[in-house]
Amino acid sequence: MSARGAERASAWAPAALVFNAFVWGTSWWPLRHLQAHGLHPLWTTALVFALACFTIAAVRPKAVGQLLHTPALWLLVVAAGCTNAAFNWAIVIGDVVRVVLLFYLMPLWTVLLARAVLGERLTRRAALRVALGTAGAAIVLWPEGQGSAIGSGAVSTVEALPVPRSLADWLGVVGGFSFACNNVLLRREASRPEEGRSLAMFAGGAIVAGALALALTAAGSVAPPPGPAAPWLVVLVALTVAFIASNLALQYGAARLPANRTAVVMLTEVVFASLSALALGGGALTARLAIGGALIVGGALLAALEPGR
């Protein structure tokens, strides 16, 4: 590639990453649209990721063999599947801004998992990331009006603890933890072919979300998918194309930018999610949420700017 071509490719790389962040940051809207047409987010995730798997297998058939014959990638299937099933479900049933912020506790989990799985040393900077994430989560999760209630004895100390209380909160936290597992496993399996890792992540979304959808449908907790109809099929196919395109954009951008710059650009997902949610009625921004969110994003930014990344 010529110097001019390399410079042009480098210039497009940040735009590709911003596109990826935009797709994921605004994905809550089509997911809620599909929910309104009777398609639960778990069924949506399973169908979208299954279509993506078939597409990858058709374009890169070697990826299928790599996945089937590499047990190490099976853990990636589980981690990626839990990430997408939890996150997509959470942003449909919960406040989008709150869910995305809880999801971005990921740097906190990454520090702990990198220590346990990769044997990485816990540095002062890493400890600061944990402290920022923990403080931010405590502020976001602190129950409304509970501070004065504790002093008056109206509620117990346990009831006033800043812990997830709704299903959406728990799914946001679980999604972020699973994404941290996903990232640690990707680092551990960095020598594996890229198409095998990509297929593993898409297969995880299809398998985990599909299994949960089947189990909850059998239990009567989730409605079965509606009959084929243009209003939701068109959106489903469009969402599949968007997710595949965003994955390609992520690979393009991440391959051409340093990891720290990639991580910083990817934080724009929080901006896209927050602005779209506030504009379209998917969430609300309170002062407490803004303060807690600033600490959580600060921890993520500190992780992104860590030397040597």
Question: Model regions: which residues?
Answer:
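Hydrophobic transmembrane alpha-helices of multi-pass small-molecule transport proteins
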Residues: 56, 125-144, 150-156, 288-307
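Transmembrane alpha-helical segments that form core, pore/gating elements
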Residues: 17, 21, 25-33, 56, ...
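C-terminal transmembrane-helix exit sites in multi-pass transporters
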Residues: 60-62, 106-128, 271-291
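Loop-to-transmembrane-helix transition segments
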Residues: 12-20, 63-86, 166-175, 223-245, ...
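C-terminal-most transmembrane helix of multi-pass membrane proteins
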Residues: 2, 142-143, 263, 267-309
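Specific transmembrane alpha-helical segments of multi-pass solute transporters/efflux pumps
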Residues: 26, 63-98, 103, 139-140, ...
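Helix-helix packing/entry segments at the starts of transmembrane helices
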Residues: 100-105, 189-205, 243-279
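Transmembrane alpha-helices of multi-pass small-molecule transport proteins
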Residues: 12-13, 23, 37-82, 109, ...
